[in-house]
């Protein structure tokens, strides 16, 4: 997750999922849990779908026809689905717990893209169900007090905060005459045409 909008959480979650999916024998699923303002399909070039997390939870956790499989790298995606009226209630439901339990039997790693922590209750609900949480922070934009507020909120929700991911950082490599950026907005993501138990709530 991130503290507020525009930090780069979704592209971070997508890049993390793609990178992990390239590891041999590691089955990865990316769950788009930002049912209010999803951007995962944009980064992965997925078409709008009428099914996804919102419809799965409305069907009591039944995933038939909702998972999307990418070939290269071999990544499975559960899109957010149609905009839900009460996302927090769905994420806190028994159906969500059942869904995560099912995914853990099929995948080695579950990466969840959650909404901003200070915007809605959803991230706190997801954090309590995840094995670990990454907080995405945008360099040069996010204020220190905002990050601390997000950290404190996650701690109150008993989240296992693994650390922070700093985005939009420029650095200079000795011997080269140009700057490179982490998580460029036009990154390789756009070129991207489980038995396990790890669940990571990542963050855009």
Identify what each model region corresponds to.
Residues 1-204:
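P-loop NTP-binding module
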